[in-house]
Amino acid sequence: MHQADQDFNYWWNTSGPWVEEPNVRRSGTSGVQRVMHNGTTVYVKRQTGHLFRSLKYPFGRPTVLREGKALSKLQELGVAAPQPIFYSAKKIDGVWQGLLVTKDLNGFQDLDTWYDNGGQARLSEHEHLQLLERLATLLAKMHLGRWQHGCMRSKHVFMKERNTAAGIEVELALLDLEKSHGRATTLRAARHDIPQLRRHSYWSVAEWRTFLACYEKVLGQPLGSDVHANVQPRRRALS
């Protein structure tokens, strides 16, 4: 048996508590388990018959291969995201099985949960503006590499607080990159992700102006007046 097959079989047969229970998506199944490996926590995504289709792959290609490639590309661009340890796919009796193994982002949580749990109240106004500027810089760096997230929502941005002598600082990372792929130009990537993020985030118009000003400064070009048009912020659900 080749080493690649041995590695695939090893990861396929690991087990641990479910982080995402197996569910049916894209006419296939997908689930994620938290697994201990050599004393560290990793996340193992297993998929069966879970494919995406494109002009290049009209008959379908395992989604984990696109996501693994995206994570590797973000590493190359210096954009924080889970580090891929292993990803591969193979056909068993005519059905694709796919694997993606990533390192744990220890201490991170998604932005929506952080806001809903009162995270913003722990920051000064200046610190919160810094959070928006850090996110703007992170996304601009990805788009300058002509790469788009593809499903840009605030819940797919993960953050971690750090107490420093100067106050609270935040680290940011991007997750859920199943739809992520390269684009022909920076602007195409930007004009896909940024309006999508606007529709699926809670920030006020004023906060978005701060975000966009920083984003366009790093990007080095404007996105267009339509992106700057005021959009009603998504409302938080009442508890």
PLM region spans:
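Conserved kinase catalytic-core helix
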Residues: 73, 77-80, 108, 114-155
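Active-site beta-strand-loop-beta-strand hairpin of nuclease catalytic cores
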Residues: 37-41, 165-172
